[in-house]
Amino acid sequence: FESKISTSKYGMGCKMNSFKTPTGLHSVSSMLGRGLPAGTLFKNRRPTGKVIKKIPHSNSDYITSRILRLNGLEEGKNKGGDLDSYNRYIYIHGTPHYNTLGSRQSQGCIRMSDRDVIKLFDLVDQKTLVLID
């Protein structure tokens, strides 16, 4: 399974409030959105009831379709203190901004197309290992 993704426009890094995409070994800690329609918009990890069907004119960091929340597994790198991916709310999630996939545009999360994040969601489970390199 291959997919175009988008990572942080600020580069790679693990520090809290850096808005960078963390590196290293992670696991899927929670999975949200099972059974919801493609394009379902989330706010604070809850579905809003809205479904986004086309690319929005705004550059907002929309979280759509599915959320796979990541937990860092490397103490001192992406786990613990101000380097903790879980406490930074780092996700793999859907985006309606398909035109930005393949470039660095997120605020730290890993963005995928709605179709691809749904496919990935159906292939993995909690505790699945994720290496961000």
Predicted regions and their residues:
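Residues that form or immediately flank small-molecule/cofactor binding pockets and catalytic motifs
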Residues: 10, 33, 97
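Surface loops and adjacent helix of pleckstrin homology
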Residues: 5, 31, 122
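N-terminal post-signal-peptidase region of extra-cytosolic proteins
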Residues: 3-18, 47-55, 114-115
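Well-ordered beta-strand positions in beta-sheet-rich domains
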Residues: 2-4, 25, 129
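Exported/periplasmic cell-wall-interacting domains
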Residues: 36-133
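Short, surface-exposed secondary-structure junctions/capping segments
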Residues: 13-32
